Amino acid sequence: MLPHLPPHIVQSSRLLQCKCGTPLALRFYQHDGDDYRLLTEMYQGFEPKEQSQGLPARLEQQREGWLRYMANKGINLLAIMEGKVVGHAALFEMEHGLRYEYLIFVHQDYQDRGVGTALTEMIKELAQEMGFDQIWLTVAAINRKAIHVYQKVGFCIVGPRDFECVMMLPLKQGDPR
């Protein structure tokens, strides 16, 4: 279970401009309000479905179960542009207090605008502030764009495979890269 987020973090948001100059808001998922509906709408229009380890699920019922799980068990960060959720990043605890898994999806109509980089940088800052040791993820080995973004933020490949790369972001001083 992830640690409880302090209110000053949950209520924080960041206003930026994407590469094309459109305003971009980053904020943490709120359980009260429209966030679940907005997140569901993003994933309904997300293509291709099941592109990353079967996610997001093609079937609506499975996708909604996955979204409810993330909303309740993870730290979720939303990217909002033009009144819509266009990106979603989340952290999940894998080893108590040590390792946290990272996932991110940016809607295909909003890729290559800096949304993924902004989400990843804000998640990294949060993890450092909360004292996490490391964040890890898996990414398709052919997804060069995503690998480039992760490396730019500080992730390194620690376990290449034929179809996937395991990447890790050390957050403590002295962690090997």
What annotation goes with each model-predicted range?
Residues A127-T138:
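Conserved GNAT acetyl-CoA-binding A-motif
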Residues T117, E121, A141-G159, F163-C165:
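Conserved active-site alpha-helix within GNAT-family acetyltransferase domains
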Residues K172-R177:
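Short, charged/polar, Gly/Pro-enriched secondary-structure boundary elements
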Residues G33, Q44-L103, H107:
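Acetyl-CoA-dependent GNAT
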Residues L103-D112, V139-A140:
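A short, internal acetyl-CoA/4′-phosphopantetheine-binding micro-motif in the GNAT/acyltransferase core
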Residues M1-P23:
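Acyl-donor-binding surface of acyltransferase catalytic domains
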Residues T22-E41:
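A short beta-loop-alpha structural element at the N-terminal edge
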Residues D112-T120, A127:
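Glycine-rich acyl-CoA binding loop
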